[in-house]
């Protein structure tokens, strides 16, 4: 049996590894000639870390995951802690530590694990067809590839999604812009083992440790889509949006490199009622494009891969296996997308009365409520 995997990002490579573990040959195709990850880093929470270990890639997480031991929210003006707490209870309850990791490092290490030479780059899909014998995809260079099944892990702009769904869904602007990048850890910004988030005015500034003595940082600002802002205006834009914010925020704006800082308008897509059509399955962002507000986008793709591998260990009936994959994943990924959307709206001031109430909750937070919510999300994954 042979699978075609479209996309060599986190989801596609996880899927290829999972299928190979289940005894299925995989050919992996990637649209671009060189993968340049969108975003500087990614939060891999314990459900994702467990998936990576299950797939044989646990060493990547252990080596490149940042030392995240505490969490704190700080007042945007004073910089004083609203709440601060240890993540030890979360680690104890979930059985794994969270691993914030540079996207470039994660992508590189996963490619090396799969085998960079085993990925065919520069292969952008135009269409696919299914018949009784299998699935065929065609690429923009005129070539084609055939297999017994097809995994569409081609991202939030998936070319194969409309074929599976029977319609072309519209991406939904979440209402905010995110700037993100990497800077050297500086205790004047935040403790080097802590996820620190400054909140106020429906905006936030966050710092999270990754490997090699660096912080992953991001700024969120509720804004209209399509503003004429770029790297040339970046520092001035952030200085304007965060005028009057605490000294560490000003220091971060001064320290960042505009040329390596990403500016992203955040979108999601309404959850789908299906992920499979015949021999073709959607996986990762192609199947559930979410905002990053609960840090579960990459983890969900890893979960997809683990379930995909498991269903093919149970049966070699492709249609039955993919129906079971869909049955196990649809409700889970819908829940994650909608949880992230709800969190997004509260964080970014869609209703400032609710956002102000959240700020007050943070001032009374011991950590227990937040950790309970995170554990509920994490432990609902396929590996518990």
Curated annotation (Swiss-Prot):
Keyword check for NAD: yes
Molecular-function annotations in GO: FAD binding; FAD-dependent urate hydroxylase activity; oxidoreductase activity, acting on paired donors, with incorporation or reduction of molecular oxygen, NAD(P)H as one donor, and incorporation of one atom of oxygen; urate oxidase activity
Keywords: FAD, Flavoprotein, Monooxygenase, NAD, Oxidoreductase, Purine metabolism
Domain of life: Bacteria
Binding site for substrate: 178, 204, 216-218
Residue numbers binding FAD: 11, 30-31, 43, 125, 285, 295-299
Known cofactor(s): FAD
Site (Involved in substrate activation for the transfer of oxygen from the flavin hydroperoxide): 204
EC number: 1.14.13.113
Annotated metabolic or biological route of this protein: Purine metabolism; urate degradation
Gene3D superfamilies the UniProt entry points to: FAD/NAD(P)-binding domain
GO biological process: purine nucleobase metabolic process; urate catabolic process
Effect caused by changing residue 204 to Q: 160-fold decrease in catalytic activity. Results in the uncoupling of the NADH oxidation and urate hydroxylation reactions
Database matches in Pfam families: FAD_binding_3
Keyword Oxidoreductase: yes
Catalytic activity: urate + NADH + O2 + H(+) = 5-hydroxyisourate + NAD(+) + H2O
Self-association state and partner proteins as the record states: Monomer.
Known role: Catalyzes the hydroxylation of urate to 5-hydroxyisourate (HIU).
Sequence similarity: Belongs to the FAD-dependent urate hydroxylase family.
Protein name in the entry: FAD-dependent urate hydroxylase
Originating organism: Klebsiella pneumoniae subsp. pneumoniae (strain ATCC 700721 / MGH 78578)
The encoding gene: hpxO
């Amino acid at each position: 049996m042979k699978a075609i995997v479209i996309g060599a990002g986190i989801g596609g490579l996880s899927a290829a590894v999972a299928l190979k573990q289940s005894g299925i040959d995989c050919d992996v195709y990637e649209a671009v000639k060189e993968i340049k990850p969108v975003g500087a880093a990614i939060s891999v929470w314990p459900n994702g870390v467990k998936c990576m270990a299950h797939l044989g890639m646990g060493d990547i997480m252990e080596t490149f995951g940042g030392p995240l031991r505490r969490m704190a929210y700080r007042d945007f003006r004073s910089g004083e802690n609203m709440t601060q707490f240890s993540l030890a209870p979360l680690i104890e309850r979930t059985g794994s530590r969270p691993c914030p990791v540079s996207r470039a490092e994660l992508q590189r290490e996963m490619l090396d694990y799969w085998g960079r030479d085993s990925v065919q780059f520069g292969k952008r899909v135009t269409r696919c067809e299914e018949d009784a014998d299998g699935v065929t995809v065609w690429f923009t260079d005129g070539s084609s590839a055939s297999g017994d099944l097809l995994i569409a892990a081609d991202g939030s702009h998936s070319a194969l999604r409309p074929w599976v769904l029977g319609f072309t869904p519209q991406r939904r602007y979440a209402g905010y812009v995110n700037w993100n990048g990497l800077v050297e850890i500086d205790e004047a910004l935040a403790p080097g083992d802590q996820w620190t988030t400054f909140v106020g005015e429906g905006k936030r500034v966050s710092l999270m440790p990754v490997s090699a003595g660096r912080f992953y940082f991001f700024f969120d600002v509720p804004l209209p889509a399509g503003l004429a802002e770029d790297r040339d205006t970046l520092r001035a834009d952030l200085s304007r949006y965060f005028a009057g914010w605490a000294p560490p925020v000003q220091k971060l704006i001064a320290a960042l490199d505009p040329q390596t800082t990403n500016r992203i308008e955040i979108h999601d897509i309404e959850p789908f009622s299906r992920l499979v059509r015949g021999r073709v399955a959607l996986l990762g962002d192609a199947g559930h494009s979410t905002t990053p507000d609960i840090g579960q986008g990459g983890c969900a793709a890893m979960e997809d891969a683990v379930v995909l591998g498991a269903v093919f260990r149970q049966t070699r009936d492709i249609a039955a296996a993919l129906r079971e994959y869909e049955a196990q994943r649809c409700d889970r990924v819908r829940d994650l997308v909608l949880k992230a959307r709800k969190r997004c709206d509260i964080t970014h001031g869609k209703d400032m009365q609710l956002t102000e109430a959240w700020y007050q909750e943070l001032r009374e937070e011991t950590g227990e409520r937040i950790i309970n919510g995170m554990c509920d999300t994490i432990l609902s994954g396929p590996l518990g």
